[in-house]
Amino acid sequence: MNFSEVIGQEAVKERLSQMVKEGHLPHALLFCGPHGTGKMALAMSFASYLLAGDEVEDATSPSVANARAMLQKWEHPDLHFSYPTIKLPSMSSDHQPVSTDFAKEWHELIMQGTYFTMNQWMKEMGATTQQAIITGAESDELSRVLALKSSQGGYKISIIWLPERMN
């Protein structure tokens, strides 16, 4: 996904590009704003920008072409997602759900597009009356994943969708 695919947010996209070009990229960014403003789409396009360069960069380089191919399917090994999950009846009573429990459902949702709602995600997970949260086990898993060395030698990125649902 390229910045050009994000609706609006021109000033923010320009500022993000400028931070990268100047080498002043912080270790964490929080994208916040009203519901429906494309924060997730912006975060995902910025992750693509960091992992594979901008859309005008020469794509003939094998590493850039490879990164772009992985990002087309949102399967880049240095891009990780954390998101609210539910406890399914089939899970043991002591199991705290983590994002990897719902990786297939998440992948299906983001492949449909980067603009989606919590209701769409709940439906994708098969939720009935549960509340979706980001568990303590997810925080542990995130720490474990981010402690690993970058697979492709560049950035490691974690996108936490709806961090306000951390419990």
Model feature map: region roles:
Residues N2-R165:
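Clamp-loader machinery-focused feature within the broader ASCE/P-loop NTPase space
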